Amino acid sequence: MSEEKIPLIGEKFPEMEVITTHGKIKLPDYYQGKWFVLFSHPGDFTPVCTTEFYSFAKKYEEFKKLNTELIGLSVDSNISHIEWVMWIEKNLKVEIPFPIIADPMGNVAKRLGMIHAESSTSTVRAVFIVDDKGIVRLIMYYPMEIGRNIDEILRSIRALQLVDKSGVVIPANWPNNELIGNKVINPPPRTVKDAKLRINQPFDWWFTYKEI
């Protein structure tokens, strides 16, 4: 499995059966009809990872409102995951409602390109956003030293779902873009005729936007 090509944006998420804190799960079929975020962390019982899991848990309902589930992963054992989840619930008073993949041999992590040069064994902080058709839509990598921005992951899902629904493209820092606020950008014109119809629109024919 580790010798196969790492999935890219726009490709089908690879089929795999994994052991998790919620039992065996077959991906991506387990989340058929839903989006899911698969995120890796370097290790259980580590401070930065604990802050991330706390934040994911606190915002879990926001993900669910977007028809999106969460699933974690590290190269720790399932027993380690279970002990860590129980520690978080007892000491931080928050339930971890999503499964965590146990990947002690690193096969899943290698298949998904989560083992980077700074460590030959531990996973970096990778994020795969997969849509309701099992297609990889976004990939992020954070170094071990920096915790993820969970709001940015939520923003990315909202943006991707809006792109699918409305056929628009999304500006920087949306929905608080410095030029156009919460508006979205029209895709480039496909013909000269379409371009001429946009000549008098701000900012120019190649840069038009609208309310959504």
From Swiss-Prot:
Q: Which domain of life is it from?
A: Archaea
Alphabetical GO CC annotations of the entry are: cytosol
Which GO BP terms, alphabetically?
cell redox homeostasis; cellular response to stress; hydrogen peroxide catabolic process; response to oxidative stress
Name of this chain's protein:
Peroxiredoxin 2
- Entry binding sites for substrate: 125
Species source reads: Sulfurisphaera tokodaii (strain DSM 16993 / JCM 10545 / NBRC 100140 / 7) (Sulfolobus tokodaii)
Q: Which residues form the active site?
A: 49
What remark does the entry add?
A: The active site is a conserved redox-active cysteine residue, the peroxidatic cysteine (C(P)), which makes the nucleophilic attack on the peroxide substrate. The peroxide oxidizes the C(P)-SH to cysteine sulfenic acid (C(P)-SOH), which then reacts with another cysteine residue, the resolving cysteine (C(R)), to form a disulfide bridge. The disulfide is subsequently reduced by an appropriate electron donor to complete the catalytic cycle. In this 1-Cys peroxiredoxin, no C(R) is present and C(P) instead forms a disulfide with a cysteine from another protein or with a small thiol molecule.
Question: Reaction catalysed by this chain?
Answer: a hydroperoxide + [thioredoxin]-dithiol = an alcohol + [thioredoxin]-disulfide + H2O
What GO molecular function terms would the record report? Answer: thioredoxin peroxidase activity
Indicate the segments forming the Thioredoxin domain, all copies.
7-162
Q: What is its main location?
A: cytoplasm
Checking NCBIfam families in the record gives: PRK13189.1 (NF009668), PRK13191.1 (NF009670)
Its annotated function is as follows:
Thiol-specific peroxidase that catalyzes the reduction of hydrogen peroxide and organic hydroperoxides to water and alcohols, respectively. Plays a role in cell protection against oxidative stress by detoxifying peroxides.
